[in-house]
Design a protein with these regions (language model features):
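Walker A/P-loop nucleotide-binding motif
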Residues: 119-141
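Short glycine-rich substrate-engagement loop in P-loop NTPases that contacts/grips substrate
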Residues: 102-110, 145-189, 208
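N-terminal pre-Walker A segment at the start of P-loop NTPase domains
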Residues: 93-118
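Walker B catalytic acidic pair
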Residues: 196-198
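Short cysteine-rich clusters marking metal-coordination/redox-active sites
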Residues: 17-23, 45-48
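Interdomain "pre-motor" coupling segment immediately N-terminal to P-loop NTPase/helicase cores
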Residues: 36-84
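Cys/His-rich microdomains that often coordinate metals
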Residues: 24-32, 49-52
Length: 272
């Protein structure tokens, strides 16, 4: 498969030369790697890393090398989720409810989905976050995604419906990038897929490519028993027009969950 158009990687700054004081190591090439929290981190001496992981050495040195490698893998996995800088600080605790019962309920449903992800993953159980624009759906979806990546080492991705369609459309125009088959396989492969902004376009009966494409994505994950989270400002009655009635059935099957977001926009003064 060609390189991903949907799952980003950490940025890297131009490499430089550093010097290791360990006997026989000397100079090595180092680079700055972007961190999920917004910082940058320089890579260490590769010979020191290799020796710590492969040769007999002090247990604390070996443990530190393993911890560093795991931190690098986690950083890559978090970047690959596609969570943008605006939503990287979104957690369940930073979701402001102001003791509003509807907000507390939505927060609770999403938190439980994340904490019980192992069961939902085995069942391929979907979750729909439906409600008004700007009331925290993406915030809580990103909180779920970060939790399952950090706690379960899951592979996840959040992507808008429009971005899926654009990537597939681009694949028809060029032989240089991934094909439609590659893109659909990538969307099917992740442990948890979040499809955001479903229903933002105006449906065109008989000419609308989006519902059939989203149905294909959802159905493929359904066949593989992999969970999907869908975010939309449409309600349950309107949503089938944007994903197809069969895809709606797939999302409801096997105890599919729904978190209703029934309050007005919270974007003024906060992340939604």
């Amino acid at each position: 498969m060609t390189s991903s158009k949907l799952r980003p990687a950490p940025g890297e700054r131009a490499p430089g030369i550093a010097k290791c004081e360990a006997p026989g190591h000397g100079q090595y090439e180092t680079k700055q790697v972007e961190q999920f929290d917004g910082g940058w981190k320089a890579t260490d001496c590769p010979r020191c890393r290799w020796e710590a992981l492969n040769l007999q050495c002090d247990a604390s040195v070996r443990d530190a090398a393993y911890a560093e490698r795991e931190a690098e893998e986690l950083n890559r996995d978090l970047f690959a989720t596609g969570i943008t800088p605006r939503f990287r600080g979104c957690t369940f605790d930073t979701f402001i409810t102001n003791a509003d019962s509807a907000k507390v309920r939505a927060q609770s449903i999403c938190r439980r989905y994340a904490e019980e992800f192992e069961d939902h993953y085995r069942a391929g159980r979907a979750l729909m976050l439906l409600g008004e624009v700007g009331n925290g759906k993406t915030h809580l979806a990103c909180a779920i995604l970060q939790h399952v990546v950090r706690e379960y080492a899951a592979k996840g991705l959040i992507v808008t419906a429009e971005a899926i369609m654009q990537a597939v459309t681009d694949s028809f125009r060029s032989n240089a990038g991934p094909s439609k088959s590659d893109l659909l396989a990538e969307l099917a492969a992740v442990d948890l897929l979040v499809i955001d902004e479903v229903g933002m376009h105006t449906p065109r009966p008989g000419k609308d490519f989006m519902p059939s494409l989203l149905h294909e994505v959802i159905d493929r994950r359904y066949q593989l028993v992999r969970p999907t989270i869908l975010i939309s400002n449409q309600d349950r009655e309107q949503l089938p027009a944007f994903i197809g009635p069969r895809a709606m059935d797939r999302l409801r099957e096997n105890g599919g969950l729904l978190a209703p977001f029934t309050w007005s926009s919270a974007r003024v003064g906060g992340v939604a």
